[in-house]
Amino acid sequence: HPSISSESQIILTLKILGGLSIREISTTLLKKEEAIAKAYTRAKKKFKAEEIQLVLPSANEVEKRLEMVLKIVYLLFNEGYKSSEGEQLIREELCIEAIRLNKVLLESALCNTPSANALLALMYFHSSRFNARVDEQGEMVSLEHQDRSKWDQQLIQEGLHYLSKASESDDVNDYI
């Protein structure tokens, strides 16, 4: 909601909808855990105090807010791609959810933008390497040492498809 700061929107969304912990959000945003906890509490209080209603934005507002939504989807994916806490190095369920959310956005003509397509391509390319990113001992494997035969070719093809769609425009964005 636009009456809440951008950072607070990110924090609320990652916490409430993404299910991330305050620690994970602080790592994601490169901020102190205490600062994130306070910002989360303030944003929740503001939401309740002002009785903010969540309504579907107008077409003009969708365009303005899409960049923030894509950033949140990216941050959710990023936390899954390299988990900041817990035993798992990769949390595939977060990555799958980020991809699902991005695909839902693309179903809307207003959200089917080069940025949204480029972000989905990026997520598919990264997801294609899951099977090669962790070795038998559970350690992270750098890109240069990954067994490329373990890369998921179908996900690479999906990535190429969305990269092609993103490239139909000359617009430069954060994900291409």
Model-based region annotation:
Residues 27-29:
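Alpha-helical residues within the helix-turn-helix
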Residues 1-6, 13-16, 22, 31-176:
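Amphipathic helix-loop-helix modules that constitute alpha-helical solenoid scaffolds
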